[in-house]
Amino acid sequence: MNKEMTVNGKSYTIIKLLGKGKGGYSYLAESGNNRYVLKQIHHEPCDYYQFGNKLEAEIRDYRKLKEIGIKMPVMLETDVENERILKEFIEGDTIYQLVLEDKMKTDYIEQLHRMCALLYAANTNIDYFPTNFVVHNEEIYYVDFECNDYMEEWNFENWGVKYWSKTPEFLQYVK
């Protein structure tokens, strides 16, 4: 890939696409000896989700989750003009990869339950899909910044947990 993108005038080399979400594309980026996640907001339609200003929403959600105490990468910079966010890169496998490779540990689910206790007390849900969580030094990090008002239907116990092991829902997604 190796193309360049800038954040507030500073250039970053794009190493690879890490993933595409409802709000944007996340790339592994490099500058000097440091690695980052560079997220480019996109405006592609999403059938099941309505957005206002995506960049403002990311900033607002990041601040809210930080205040709640959720373990996640640091938002280092925002580039309003180019609709880009520079985040700390958390090295490690996603929960999705660990489930796929039969390397999941019950401790990761226990850590998520502790995270949920903080979230639910703040009337908040996050996107519990396993690609949004990275394990680094045996600790889970929520690497997406999306959050919403709490709805029981979309909490971890009723929705997210279906994708944290090789359930029919997980296996259907893999196809």
PLM-predicted stretches and their roles:
Residues 111-118:
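Conserved hydrophobic core/spine positions of the Hanks-type protein kinase catalytic domain
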Residues 11-17, 22-56:
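ATP-binding glycine-rich loop module of kinase domains
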Residues 36, 71, 85, 141-144:
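Protein kinase-like catalytic core scaffold
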Residues 51, 70-109:
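Conserved structural core of kinase catalytic domains
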Residues 121-125, 136-175:
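C-lobe/activation-segment region of protein kinase-like
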Residues 1-15:
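Juxta-kinase regulatory segment immediately upstream of eukaryotic protein kinase catalytic domains
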Residues 128-133:
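Hydrophobic residue at the +6 position relative to the catalytic HRD Asp in the kinase catalytic loop
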Residues 50-68:
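The N-lobe alphaC helix and its flanking beta3-alphaC-beta4 segment of protein kinase-like domains
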